[in-house]
């Protein structure tokens, strides 16, 4: 499910929301580097990072914008690559607008948790909260909709979550609260969406994703055969 074999043109056509999200990440970081530095506090705040500073209350819109801001190239690459690999199947299953809504709500949930639980000075940015919401959506489907998520995918998601949360606890300067908030948000939003999305609709989209992946793999194998 998470093996990406599409060409760039196919990827953009099949997964428009994920493509737009990654492009926004790249554009924002490029502008930050052009006008300052993506690791400079003032530049981060100017471009919408979340913060908690003495005597200041963050504007409401930062809970949205912070998920598109990244602190350095490594931060950008890791989050964007994770989106590139793991988000497409969920976008196909939910459809573009539902997936976009889930992503945004999970990112906001992560930023709200970050602001709520941090008690001292901090600046927070990145798509990690939203990404953990995507993981949570897969986990929800793996538990409650086993017809959509195979066992291997379930094990992959659980392994990533365990490693991710351990890393969030052990490695300094990683926003555990944002990850946890996004994860809880993902479970909640996916749970609500599952009540309103017809089971047949999800099943058809999941089967379509499997068929597309299989067709792409077969095409690549044929292209690799000698004439």
Where are each of the predicted segments found?
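C-terminal ends of transmembrane helices
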Residues: 4-5, 83-91, 139-146
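Alpha-helical membrane-inserting segments
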Residues: 27-32, 109, 113, 117, ...
